[in-house]
């Protein structure tokens, strides 16, 4: 199997990704039998709920030290000590110390909303013609709202993929007035690159939530959280119709991998050059929450 690589933004070096449960992932997404099992798991909500319930049991705490060591997770960033976590899910949804994720300054700067691997498409209209295994990405299916499709069809889109080892709380990328969240029911297919290489429209089929953010510098911004295999719960901690500063927490994903998608209207943001360069090469850029994503083009 071809190794997954990304650019580490902190070093600008190409890195081979450590795949959690690699043998299991290879079985699920590279074999005929495994793909059948994966589809069954993704289309059976009870199994995801059962998995989530298990990860909330106190005895799952014993997995935490080994997981931290294998994935080289920095424990100094944790708000809690390891001994304070009540379950593996409690660890998975951990909070960090505020100083662990400094927020890029400037009211014209949009920041990365999560820790994760980023791909940027500055022109959705061009991306709409992108074909993966003969399957077109559909903005209409993703949003399920004709007015929103028309509004963002010529804008930009950012995909941020969270791995199992990532910090799984998501944050506001800009100063905004946050609207209500709309839930779109769907399946729970994996968003791992092994799955996406066969069908990018997984994002349009999975359970997801959608929130529109009103901003002064970036117009209206559309923010989506996409569930994935074993992630049935997308938890919102913000209050609708309230103003938030960039970097404020919006919510968190419970156990599993997941993705955040952010859409901008046309002509409002100039993305950082390194992110654009890597995306053009088809390489994700691994970023931390709060780093610069781009600058407003509005006066």
From Swiss-Prot:
It is a peripheral membrane protein. It comes from the Bacteria. Keywords: Cell membrane, Decarboxylase, Lipid biosynthesis, Lipid metabolism, Lyase, Membrane, Phospholipid biosynthesis, Phospholipid metabolism, Pyruvate, Zymogen. It is an enzyme of class 4 (lyase). Pathway: Phospholipid metabolism; phosphatidylethanolamine biosynthesis; phosphatidylethanolamine from CDP-diacylglycerol: step 2/2. It catalyses: a 1,2-diacyl-sn-glycero-3-phospho-L-serine + H(+) = a 1,2-diacyl-sn-glycero-3-phosphoethanolamine + CO2. Belongs to the phosphatidylserine decarboxylase family. PSD-B subfamily. Prokaryotic type II sub-subfamily. Catalyzes the formation of phosphatidylethanolamine (PtdEtn) from phosphatidylserine (PtdSer). Heterodimer of a large membrane-associated beta subunit and a small pyruvoyl-containing alpha subunit. This is Phosphatidylserine decarboxylase proenzyme. It comes from Chlamydia caviae (strain ATCC VR-813 / DSM 19441 / 03DC25 / GPIC). The lineage of its organism: Bacteria, Pseudomonadati, Chlamydiota, Chlamydiia, Chlamydiales.
């Amino acid at each position: 199997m071809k190794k997954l690589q990304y650019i580490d933004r902190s070093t600008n070096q190409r890195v081979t990704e450590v795949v959690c449960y690699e043998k299991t992932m290879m079985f699920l997404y590279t074999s005929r039998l495994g793909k059948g099992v994966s589809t069954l798991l993704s289309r059976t909500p009870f199994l995801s709920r059962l998995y989530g319930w298990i990860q909330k049991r106190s005895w799952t705490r014993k997995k935490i030290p080994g997981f931290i060591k294998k994935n080289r997770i920095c424990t100094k960033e944790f708000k809690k000590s390891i001994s304070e976590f009540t379950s593996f899910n409690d660890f998975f949804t951990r909070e960090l110390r505020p100083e662990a994720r400094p927020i890029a300054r400037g009211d014209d700067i949009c920041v990365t909303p999560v820790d994760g691997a980023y791909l940027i498409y500055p022109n959705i209209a061009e991306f709409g013609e992108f074909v993966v295994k003969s399957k077109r990405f559909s903005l209409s299916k993703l949003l399920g709202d004709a007015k929103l499709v028309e509004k963002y069809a010529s804008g930009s889109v950012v995909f941020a993929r969270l791995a199992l080892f990532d910090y799984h709380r998501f944050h506001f990328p800009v100063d905004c007035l946050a609207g209500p969240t709309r839930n779109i029911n769907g399946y729970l297919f994996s968003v791992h690159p092994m799955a996406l290489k066969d069908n990018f429209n997984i994002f349009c089929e999975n359970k997801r939530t959608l929130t529109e953010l009103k901003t002064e510098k970036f117009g209206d911004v559309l923010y989506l959280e996409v569930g994935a295999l074993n992630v049935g719960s997308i938890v919102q901690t913000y209050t609708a119709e309230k103003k938030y500063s960039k970097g404020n927490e919006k919510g968190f994903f419970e156990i599993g991998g997941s993705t955040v998608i952010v859409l901008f209207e046309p002509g409002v943001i100039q993305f950082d050059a390194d992110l654009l360069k890597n995306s053009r090469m088809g390489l994700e850029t691994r970023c931390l929450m709060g780093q610069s994503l781009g600058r407003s083009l509005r006066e």
